[in-house]
Amino acid sequence: MEPELDLTLKLGLPNSTVETHLTLSPPTTTTDQGTNVVDGGEVINHRRGLLGDDEVIHNEPTRNNVEFNIRIYNYVFQQFVGAPNTLNFAPYPMPPSPAPAPETPPVSDEYVLIDVPARRARRNNSTVMTNSWKENATPKRIRGCGGFCGGRIEGMKKCTNMNCNALNTPMWRRGPLGPKSLCNACGIKFRKEEERKAKRNVVIVLDD
């Protein structure tokens, strides 16, 4: 009991402070770590005064705990105390917001969008890939059709419906881009949709 009393008197610290801050075990809780961060320099000096430099250097658990506190203390010191103009903190500038991308207008003079069954769309897209023009393109396909005949793939006719892309069809039909711009299926669907719109417009006029 007497050595403990002498130790407390030499350090000038109450017993509670010695027991709280001079533990030899690594910090295990957030509260302990926070205490060691704030009083990092004092804790290290108290341990060296209590244990001696030899114990701090050669005792592995003690050395690890001291090194841990040194790293934490140095980090806090460099971030706050050692920073120039410590009292004049300026908010970190936020990066400027990127300029909004310009809206891409629909290329209405090159293609249209009409819903088609997914199975037919996959089949037609596969056909487009396998029939893309290379060295073996036949003169007939290169010539294509006379006049305006919808989309083309290097001279080959193609349905202008971007969801369809049909290359082969019993006949080409009129679409939003003109005559023979849609395949047979898309042309029929487009015509029926136009008829439904016309009927709805008639009903609206009669109601008014």
UniProtKB/Swiss-Prot annotation:
Keywords: DNA-binding, Metal-binding, Nucleus, Transcription, Transcription regulation, Zinc, Zinc-finger. GO terms for molecular function: sequence-specific DNA binding; zinc ion binding. InterPro entries: Znf_GATA, Znf_NHR/GATA. GO terms for cellular component: nucleus. Belongs to the type IV zinc-finger family. Class B subfamily. PANTHER family: GATA ZINC FINGER DOMAIN-CONTAINING PROTEIN 14-RELATED (PTHR47172:SF24), OS01G0976800 PROTEIN (PTHR47172). A zinc finger (GATA-type) spans 155-208. It is found in: Nucleus. Transcriptional regulator that specifically binds 5'-GATA-3' or 5'-GAT-3' motifs within gene promoters. It comes from the Eukaryota. SUPFAM superfamilies: Glucocorticoid receptor-like (DNA-binding domain) (SSF57716). It comes from Arabidopsis thaliana (Mouse-ear cress). Its main location: nucleus. One of its GO terms (biological process) is regulation of DNA-templated transcription. This is GATA transcription factor 29. SMART domains: ZnF_GATA (SM00401).
